[in-house]
Amino acid sequence: MTFNKIFKYLISLLFLSILFHTIIHKNNLVFSKTMHKKVAFFSFSIFFVWIRHLKRYNSMLEKATFFVLQTSYTNELKGLYIAGNSYPYYQDKKKLVFNSFQKPFKNHQSTKIPRE
């Protein structure tokens, strides 16, 4: 499991635990026990909005990270280059960043061990 899946799983568990807490105890940390069940569900809706905000922030982080898959053929060698950058950075310098990965493969020579 990736970190994002674990994070979403924990958020959903928090969401369900708040729901069960409001149903069973008819209150939560904000309201007292003497208040009605509908008031408790109003507070639950506030928590729901807060959790949705967290999920939206998490999805923004997912969109902000991208991975570029690039293939090239150099001296009959298929090179696979994977580079990950953060969204705000290196947008106009993508080729410069990827060229630094390609430098070792430009003058590739075979490294076969000669047989005796």
Curated annotation (Swiss-Prot):
It comes from the Bacteria. One of its GO terms (biological process) is DNA replication. Keywords: DNA replication, Plasmid. Putative control of replication message. This is Protein cop. It comes from Staphylococcus epidermidis. The lineage of its organism: Bacteria, Bacillati, Bacillota, Bacilli, Bacillales. The gene is cop.
